Structures are given as structure tokens and as C-alpha cells.
């Protein structure tokens, strides 16, 4: 039934139109409102941190990609739809029982433009939005330069493969998508309007449909020819020979590469055959051409390389792959900076030839041996330096060094941060959580080579106040008293790893002019944030935006928010760097330092590539577990540089990026893309540079590669006989590899303390020590790697063997049984240290933690014993084991009396300190070490003593120690009141 005049479209009543309009508006608000809020908040935040130009550049790049891809895809699809519609047959039988698409055809005919433009624009916008994620490739292509290194196969600069080729491939992929979508759109349109009919029993195709479909099919095949051409260059990153090596091998060069050229020619001929369908009605020629292309891809592109690999290459792989392995070695060394310009190799016997006390370098090394393990002591720091239930330290503490009174000392460091997860009761109220408990308080450090006192009584070790760190605290209280070993002028921490764990992560600071401070500072004082960081929410519009973003109406109605209020967001240092520099990959371990009286976080950042020709692939990131439980490997890269050192101010969140590698062409490209965002290396303050550490993530990648790529000769590389392995962690039962460790050791030239990141390496599928790798962190030699290579037939034990030898020692085993009655045992870092002019000293701290059955009691680790071990010089692989409450005593056990004298003495007197948790004062604070400008002088060497006499002396010393222990207990009992 019709209403109104014939040909007139029905008109909705005004009320219905208003409802439809309102409904559409609400739908649009629900769909796009949250995204618009996020965009506005990002605009404010990037402006606050001073990196709005980055946000604008990325946004404009992505919008340009969306526009370009949408225009191309929509244009090609719309052209296909328009041509198919205009060339439709004039007469199409409209019988629903014989034509199932008749109803759809009628609907389209009523709104042909709506359907045509709607489909084309929708497909174009969707493709554009997906393509916008390739903005990195676009920027690298536009601003990329040269490396000054050419590939060994084609003779092109490396810049072509890493800057240009990925962009060309991306453009080609989207042209593929556009043409395939156009082909499908044309096919469906012709079918809808009768140009292609399948209901007549044998099918029917109009001339217009045949021509149009042939053109699009030919275009697809022509694009495939271009893809084959680009495939030639991507062979240089082939994974065919992995895990042996990466890059084009013999089969790739002598079979795959010619095959690609053959397939290019066949694809071009096939495309021409499709285009002939424009003039010829016979479709058998294009069909045969398509069959030829498929058959050629199988035979020429697949079977031929497979046969060559199986019957020609594999039987002679060591010889035929030799030049390609050489290419892989050279490219990998260049891509990861593990070549001769950056790595120094030295032969090392693995057996000591001198007493450590006679070697100045060893005197320094022993004096700086680290006994505190940052992986174990976080709970100890928290329990002894927490102050309040809502303060905490990171799960893993950090290691850094400071020069106090001229003496370089390494410290275990941590920041006393606010822990949002620790707030309880009324502390979790919105006002308290976000406006009162807003910041942490203080920088806490402990000398890494000493504790307050030695823990001696094994039976009552958990009841003693021994084996704890000696803290150097720089917080609000110490600022007022002027007692700071490491001076900090602003100890408040608004940005950190722990504080950012709030969900949602934000704090509201500031307030109305003249209002009283409300942020918790100490038990007797409040504070008002005065930093430059933070997004203003002093106006109602911004308050409304943030109320919408965090879904919290109290933003609008709270009287605590005034005209000067700010909201602090994105408080994780690593996240802040990632957001302002999205082209960088950040290290997983930011660490706090004190520079010019302020606490700042240092974040190591890397430039990476995944298409460096012939370079081995590796991952800077560990495996990632998805919410569904699927474990995926981290992003694979084939080039990495620690080109940027970033800092984040812990008080106001200021982010600063410093160039740290002037020779990195990738960083130079990004600095052209985002001018002014990265400061030059000349602007790095000396005080900040002194705290730069060689990053762990990079070192772990380099040591795993050096396990293979220290080999120069391709044939030896192929046999893997000379390979090394990263040792398993002997203190971890999860089959994890041993983490590298930061240590202060004596420098070979000056004997001064040198801060390094080091790792032992064992033989391939063996447990004996094969090498020792260390990376310099001192400004003068930063980045240099030193590799000590042991003989291939060495019997020097590796970490796992040493661990087994130490814990199976009769003294260790018997006392461990005693300790385990009431304690949990934690083994600390097993440190490997070059010593004794050719030997290796292993040092491992042993921590105990009282076992408690009460849920309200708190327990935390304390240093109880020190294990040391060295190879016995006069035996085939035998070892000496030292086990004592102090490092000095352990060293005397393995090297003889006198060596322990050069070890750092304990830092305090256990008799004068109250037990932890007893309500007394905190453990003793650190005192500056004595000032020295030269390494400690080695004590004079005594006469050589026969082994039998040494054994007798050790027994006598043990008896004397037992007598002294009984005497000390008697004196303590006599001095105790009432005793």
C-alpha cells in the first residue's frame, strides 16, 4: 500500500526524526566519545611533558596514511563498482524463484549511490586505519639515510634494506588489498546485476564483466611479479638455515634467487595473458596462464630449492655454506657491536699463579666484593626502612656506584615509594588515595660489600641483629638533620615503578590558592606539590574530561580540587619514556640515581631493526604470556643500539632524552623525523654520565650471541665445537639462565675500582668454564667488552659445578641442616671474579630467613654465611671451598692466612644494636668509607708454608675461634644486668 504521491519517498514525522537523530548522536558519542577524550588527554599530557611535537608528528603521519590508503582503496573499489554498475545488462529476469538475489538487487537499485559510496568509503577507511600502524615504516623511509656499509650480494647500502624495502613492501601489500577488494566488488556487482549468472545451468558472463574481471586479475598477477622482485632482496634475511645461521645461504643464492627471476617473468607473461581477454572472448588462455603460474611457483619456487638443499647442499654444507656463514658472522658482529672494534679477547689460564694479596688488582677486587643481593633484599629494605605501611620498595632493588670522599663504592639502592596496593581501610577512600597519599619519601642505599655485623651463632641466627645492610638514608628526616651520605635536596617521589601500580594510575595535587596542605609528608607535616609536572584540572572542562576518562564523578564535586590543582598520570618512568619516544625500545630495568641533589630514574633505550641483512635474530624482550595462556616470544630484532639514555625526574616527572651513540644511523634518522626531542651527547652532565650502567637487556643479548660469534672460522662455526653456552642459574630451580651481575673489580692498568657488568660462560653442552665476559660502565671505557678465553681443555669448574661442590662440602652440608630447622635458605648471586693472576674466584652469599607460623609476624632475609671457591692449582679440577660468617674468614680458608685482611671489614658492632622489630632504632646508618686515592696496599707476603703445616694451622685457628666465641658469650653474660 502506498501513501502520498507516486515516486515520492515516505517522510518520517518530525518527532520520529528527532528520536532517530538523538539515537544516532548517542550512538556516535558511545563509539567515538572515549576516543576523543583520550585524544584530548594525550594533547594535554604531551604538552605538559614538552613533547607535543612528537604527538602531532605521529598523529599527522597516521592521518596522512589513513587518507592516502583510504583514497587509493576507496577509489579503486568505487571505480570497480561504478564500472560494473554502468555496464550491467539492460534486462534481468526478476523472478525470485529463479533469481535469489532479486530482492537485494531491488534494494540496491533504490539507493545505488549510498551502497556504492558506503561500501567503498567503509573499506577504504578500515584499510587506512589498519595501515596507519605502519607509521614507523613511513618515517624511516622519508628520513632514512645510509649506513656506509653495502651488502655482499647486491651491493646496495644497508639503508635500502632497513629504511626503503619495508616501505615498498607495505605499499605493495596495500595495492594488493585494494585490487583484490576491487576484483571481489566487481565480481559481486556483476553477479547482482546479471553480468554473471549461475542459474542457467552452465553459467553466463557478459563481455563487460569478462573485460573488467580480466583487468583486475591481470593487475593482481602483475603485482605478484613485483612481489617476486622484492622477495629477492628479502632473501638476505632468510631464516632457511636457522638456527645454524641467518641470511641467504647457498640454496637461497643459487636456487631461490634465480627462481624469483623466473617467476617474475612468468608472472608478467601471465598478466599479459589476462589482459588479452579484453580482446579475445576465449578465457582458456588466462586460465592456462594462471595454472602455469601456480605450477611454476610449486616446481620452480618450491621443489627446485628443496631438491638442491637435500641432495647438493646438505651433504657438503660445511664447504658450500662457508662464504655465507662468513657473511652472517660479519653482519651480526656489526649489527650488535660484538666485533673487534668493541670486543677485546684475552687468553686466560683459569688457574691462579699468585696469591691475591700480592696482586694490586686483586686487592681492589677483594675489597669491593659484593655481598648484598638486590634480588633477595627487597623485603629486608621494606621491613627495616618502610616507615609506614603504605611505603615500599621495588621487588628487585638496583645496583649503582657513588664516589664518597674520593672513594668509589657500589651500593644496593632503592626508592621508598608509595605503594597503592598497601593502602588499607580508610586509606583507600578516593580522597585519601588520590589526594593525600600521593608520593613516596626518600632514597635508600646500602654499601654492597658489607653488613652491620657477622652472624655467628647458627642455632640462634634468626634472633640476632647481624647480617643486615648498613643504610645510607636520604629522606625528609635526614634532610632536616643534615646527615646524608648521599645528599638529596628533594627526596619526595611522585613518579616511580611502585607508585605507578595504582589502578587507575593518577594523583591529584595542588589546590586552591591559600588552602592548607593536605598531602601526607611525615607524621607531623603535610605538603603541597610545587613541581612543574602535571596536567591542570583547574577549569571545569578539564575536570569533566578526566571525570569521564576515569569514570569518577568525584572529580566534579570534590572541594579538594581547586584552580591550582593538577593531575599526575603515567607515573611509571619506563612508560613515560615509551610514550614520548615511541620509536625506541626501553630496557626492562629503570634504576634510580641521585644527580645534583635530585632523584632521577635512568631508562636505557634502544634503536632496533628487524631487517638487517645477514644478521642473527634475537629478542630484547622475554616471552610474553597472553590472557589466554598462550606463550609468545618477544619481538625479534636483528640490530640493536643503546643509542639513548633517558631520565625521568622522580619529583616532577620531567623526561629528558640524551643521544648516546653518535654513530647510529637509525638514531640520526629519528632525530631528523623528530627534531629537538633528543639532546646531543655533549649536553649530558658529567654527574649523570658517572651513573650510566651498561644495560642488562643488551648485555644478555650480546653474551648469547658471543657464545657463537666469537668464532672466526666459518667451518669451525658450522661444527659448533668451539661454541659456548650461557650457564644455568645454580641458585634457581626454574632452569633459568644465570643473570649477569654488576661488580666493582680492579682495573688491569690502574688497579682502581672499575664498575662492570659480567657473566661466566661455559662450554657448549658442558659445565666447565670456557670464558668470562665483562662490559665496562666507567665513562672512559664505557661499552668496551672484555672476553677472557679459557683453554678448550680446561677443567676449571663452571657455576653449576661450583655450586654443587660448595653445598656438598661437609662443613656446609652439616651446618645447612642446622640452619634449615628454623630458617629458609636463600643463595645469593654466585659471582665469578678473575683473580690470582689467572684464576677465578667464586663468591656466593648465603641468606637465612626465619620460618614463622604466625601470619602477623614479618620475616626477611639476613646475610648469614659467605661461600667462596677457587680451583686447586695442584690438582686436576679440584677446588677449595671456604665457608664462614665473613668473607675475610672464607678467603683465609682457601688462600691461607692474610688474604682476608684485604677484604672489607664488617660495618658495625652487633652487640650495640637492638634486634629488628623490637621497637629500637633502625639498623646503623652508613658512614662514609675512608678516603683513599690509591688501591689498598697489599700486605707483605710471608714465607711459603708446607701444606701439612697449613692444615695444622687451620685446625689451631679453628680451636682458637671456638675459645674466643665462648669467651665473648661469657663476657656478654657478665655484662647483662641481673646476670
UniProtKB/Swiss-Prot annotation:
Keyword Transmembrane helix: yes
Record region (Disordered): 898-948
Superkingdom classification of source: Bacteria
GO cellular component, one term: extracellular region
Pfam hit, one: UPF0182
Keyword flag Kinase: no
Keywords tagged on the record: Cell membrane, Membrane, Transmembrane, Transmembrane helix
Subcellular location: Cell membrane
Skewed-composition ranges (Pro residues): 913-946
Membrane topology: Multi-pass membrane protein
Transmembrane residue ranges: 19-39, 63-83, 114-134, 174-194, 211-231, 260-280, 288-308
UniProt-listed InterPro entries: UPF0182 (IPR005372)
Family: Belongs to the UPF0182 family.
PANTHER family membership: UPF0182 PROTEIN SLL1060 (PTHR39344:SF1)
Name this polypeptide is given: UPF0182 protein MRA_0066
Organism whose genome encodes this protein: Mycobacterium tuberculosis (strain ATCC 25177 / H37Ra)
Organism phylogeny: Bacteria, Bacillati, Actinomycetota, Actinomycetes, Mycobacteriales
